[in-house]
């Protein structure tokens, strides 16, 4: 494959729709191959804006504005990095010959929990929790009574856990309803899920293109309010469960098709594995791969997009701990104790231009002989990070 210089008439060009911390790492990996990177987001100086050749600030939900950037830039590949994008623009771009990663229909299915759950459970026959879709509080009450308590309630469209809650009894439903309605994204319809008393949950990063499909070692993670706070790799699991996880991941990613990396989220109980969700892009829990693998999830994504081989080496166990802001600031500062910077730990500051309470601003990455030791170390070091 040839790699022309960027900013030339024959450059290979990526258009990132969404420019957060994951998009930033994709941009960096793309630039390592001389790819011209254009980053788009709804606010200025987003993380990927800071490392791109050019950037745009637009309303990502506006079909006209998204298409205007696509037609102006004429990218070789369009990489949606967030859910909140006008899907009609992606379908039209694809119809006009632009290559959407992995493809517009996969983005459409995965940005909406109703679409992907119906596709996974009803079309592909994958094992999932029981579920109902509701659009009124009365419908929520009826669904919760049918499925039983506790139950999980989420908007059909939201990202990073926004709007997600667990109702443990009838009295919790009103609060769950309000949480869902306040979420970013479309909260006009909710999914109510049976609560699976799982042993643990994993992300199985799955990269695919015409050269084949590869699986990264499973990543364990801990969520709070539906958003990841810790992850570690590898997650210890039985060979039977791991094989089932790979079969589910292969089925769902083959069903969606296209090139790229997918974050397949799964619940595991004993040797039983349940499909939860899938993201057709790098996954936040996968930031740990920046130090555990010869090719991070971001490098694998870029290679998959370009049709390159997907081989990699798993180096060593590791863990990640997300740092969320505790203060509101238009001039945020991340502070870290010197002990965070030892030979087997790393701090990645995302460079977001503003901090809001609970906004993810940085991540600590740690290596150790075991994933458990790495997780313990990450937990200790994240306590030595602060913001102002």
Swiss-Prot record:
This is Formate-dependent phosphoribosylglycinamide formyltransferase. It catalyses: N(1)-(5-phospho-beta-D-ribosyl)glycinamide + formate + ATP = N(2)-formyl-N(1)-(5-phospho-beta-D-ribosyl)glycinamide + ADP + phosphate + H(+). Homodimer. One of its GO terms (cellular component) is cytosol. Involved in the de novo purine biosynthesis. Catalyzes the transfer of formate to 5-phospho-ribosyl-glycinamide (GAR), producing 5-phospho-ribosyl-N-formylglycinamide (FGAR). Formate is provided by PurU via hydrolysis of 10-formyl-tetrahydrofolate. Pathway: Purine metabolism; IMP biosynthesis via de novo pathway; N(2)-formyl-N(1)-(5-phospho-D-ribosyl)glycinamide from N(1)-(5-phospho-D-ribosyl)glycinamide (formate route): step 1/1. The keyword S-adenosyl-L-methionine does not apply. Belongs to the PurK/PurT family. Mg(2+) binds at residues 265, 277. HAMAP family: PurT (MF_01643). It comes from Nitratiruptor sp. (strain SB155-2). One of its GO terms (molecular function) is phosphoribosylglycinamide formyltransferase activity. GO terms for biological process: 'de novo' IMP biosynthetic process. Its EC number is 6.3.1.21. PANTHER family: FORMATE-DEPENDENT PHOSPHORIBOSYLGLYCINAMIDE FORMYLTRANSFERASE. Residues 118-306 form the ATP-grasp domain. It holds the Pfam family ATP-grasp. The lineage of its organism: Bacteria, Pseudomonadati, Campylobacterota, Epsilonproteobacteria, Nautiliales. ATP binds at residues 113, 154, 159-164, 193-196, 201. Keywords: ATP-binding, Ligase, Magnesium, Metal-binding, Nucleotide-binding, Purine biosynthesis. N(1)-(5-phospho-beta-D-ribosyl)glycinamide binds at residues 21-22, 81, 284, 352, 359-360. PROSITE patterns: ATP_GRASP. It is an enzyme of class 6 (ligase).
């Amino acid at each position: 494959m040839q790699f022309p210089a960027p900013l030339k008439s024959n450059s290979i060009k990526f258009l990132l729709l969404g420019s957060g911390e994951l998009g930033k790492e994709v941009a960096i990996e793309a630039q390592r191959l001389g790819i011209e990177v254009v980053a788009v987001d709804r606010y200025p100086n987003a993380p990927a804006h800071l490392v791109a050749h050019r950037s745009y600030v637009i309303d990502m939900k506006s079909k006209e504005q998204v298409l205007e950037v696509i037609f102006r830039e004429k990218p070789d590949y369009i990489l949606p990095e967030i859910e909140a994008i006008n899907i009609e623009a992606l379908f039209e771009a694809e119809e006009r010959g632009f290559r959407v990663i992995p493809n517009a229909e996969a983005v459409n299915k995965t940005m909406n929990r109703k679409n992907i759950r119906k596709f996974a459970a009803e079309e592909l026959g994958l094992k999932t929790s029981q579920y109902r879709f509701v659009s009124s509080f009365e419908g929520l009450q009826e669904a919760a009574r049918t499925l039983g308590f506790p139950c999980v309630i989420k908007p059909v469209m939201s990202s990073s856990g926004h709007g997600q809650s667990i109702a443990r009894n009838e009295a919790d439903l009103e609060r769950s309803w309000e949480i869902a309605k306040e979420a970013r994204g479309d909260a006009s319809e909710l999914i109510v899920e049976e609560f699976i008393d799982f042993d643990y949950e994993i992300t199985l990063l799955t990269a695919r293109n015409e050269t084949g499909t590869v699986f990264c070692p499973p990543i364990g993670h801990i969520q709070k309010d539906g958003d990841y706070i810790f992850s570690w790799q590898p997650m210890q699991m039985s060979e039977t469960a791991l094989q089932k996880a790979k079969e589910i991941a292969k089925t769902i990613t083959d069903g969606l098709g296209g090139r790229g990396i997918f974050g397949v989220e799964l619940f595991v109980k004993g040797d039983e594995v349940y499909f939860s969700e899938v993201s057709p892009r790098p996954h936040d829990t996968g930031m740990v791969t920046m130090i555990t693998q010869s090719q991070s999830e971001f490098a694998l994504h870029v290679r998959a997009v370009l049709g390159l081989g997907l081989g990699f080496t798993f180096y060593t166990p590791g863990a990640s701990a997300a740092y969320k802001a505790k203060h509101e600031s238009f001039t945020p500062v991340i502070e870290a104790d010197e002990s965070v910077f030892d030979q087997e730990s790393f701090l990645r500051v995302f460079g977001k231009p503003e901090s809001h309470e609970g906004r993810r601003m940085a991540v600590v990455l740690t290596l150790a002989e075991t994933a458990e030791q790495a997780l313990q170390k990450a937990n200790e070091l994240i306590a030595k990070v602060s913001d102002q």
